[in-house]
Amino acid sequence: QQVLAAFSADGALAKAIKGFSLRLVQQQMAEAVSDSISSRQNLVVEAGTGVGKTFAYLIPALLSHKQIIVSTGSKNLQEQLFYKDLPALLLMLGLSPKVALLKGRNNYLCQHLMEKELSGASSMDTQILDDLLRINQWAGQTTDGDLGGLTAVSESSQALPLISSAKETCIGQRCDHYDVCFTRKARNRAMDAQVIVVNHHLFLADKIIKETGFAELLPDPDVVIFDEAH
């Protein structure tokens, strides 16, 4: 079995991680997750510190080659999973599925609002204007518009709420930036990916939106994993 082989003494983890030692509890958890996926049954796992739960659920999920949504309890964990754990594991396992990170829309820069705010810059507070100019410079460099990657201004900057994407200010297809909209592109990537990393707030928001029958943020995957479900 591929899952057991990955955790074995000469498996993918042992070859890639210096000083790797087999942890029986981690292997047992991975087996339980694998069985749950293949039998399409729900599974609840309580894992103590040091078990290595992230690898224990990701490896069987990735090796199933099914469409997966991993939902985390915080944006910090979401980013660690997407930028660190997931790339490392895919490299170890020799896999290359399409992966996507999706956050709530207020985490993305709105080019329309950015343009609007800069057009009224003459009457603006100097600190806010300075921050807006820094954000605008970053906007020309970012590929995803995720404000989590913005380091040029403080997280508490008063400029951020002014240029964050919001349902209330979105003008949809009438927007000059519609084709390059960061929020729209992030959602399209998520719909097209095999592995999607979200947080609980977004996952549940998608469920509410789907109940209206008008829209959806996420696909209906084969596997959903809640990390930090408590």
Features from the language model and the residues they span:
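Conserved pre-motif I regulatory segment
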Residues: Q2-V44
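SF2 helicase catalytic motif II
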Residues: L218-H230
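Walker A/P-loop
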Residues: S39-Y57
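Conserved helix/coil segment N-terminal to the catalytic DExD/H
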Residues: R184-M191, H201-P219
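Conserved P-loop NTPase motor core
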Residues: F55-P60, G94, K98, I208, ...
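Walker A/P-loop NTP-binding motif
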Residues: S34-D35, T54-Q67, K84-A88
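A substrate-engagement module of RecA-like helicase motors
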Residues: Q2-A16, Q67-I68, T72-I196, H201
